[in-house]
Amino acid sequence: ARAYIATDPHYQSKYYAGGYPDDGLGVCTDVIWQALQAAGYDLKALVDADIAACPEAYPHITTPDPNIDFRRVNTLDTFFRRHAQVLTCDLSDGQQWQPGDIVVFGDRVHIGLCSDRRNRQGIPFLIHHGNPIDEAVERNDIPRMTVTGHFRWLG
């Protein structure tokens, strides 16, 4: 995730043939697939296979599109609820929040990754790419947003 934010991508939601941004632009979901790719997982292939195997789990997708489905927060929220460990959204116990955990915010509008850095209360910093700030950052943002999903990918 840090390698992705180090490229200083600009925030822009855009459709890509093949699915992967290649022009220095990106969105919050790119942090997630990039981090999983660095760990040896092909999130795009996993999401595409799950949509094909269980389309009813993804009612927001009327026609699957492998070029974009894995880059939508609501799709990733559904995928991680089905295939990752679902954890607490309560921030009161910082030890429940570990580096690499995936966090969804609001009405499935934003997603990021927990850092190994923590604030004074023990809550991890968030590695994410946000709009309208147009920044890919690692900072103390989790407490400022409404957490609606918290997942741990176990592979």
Report each predicted region and the residues it spans.
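...with weaker cross-activation on analogous glycine-rich loops/strands in unrelated enzymes
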Residues: A52-P132
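A structural signal for short, hydrophobic beta-strand segments that form beta-sheets
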Residues: L43-K44, C114, T146-V147
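Proteins with a high burden of low-complexity, intrinsically disordered sequence enriched in S/T/G/P/A and R
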Residues: Y4-S13, G19, H110-L113, I133-D134, ...
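N-terminal capping segments
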Residues: A1-R81
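Low-complexity, Gly/Ser/Thr/Pro-rich intrinsically disordered linker/tail segments
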Residues: G122-D134, E138-G155
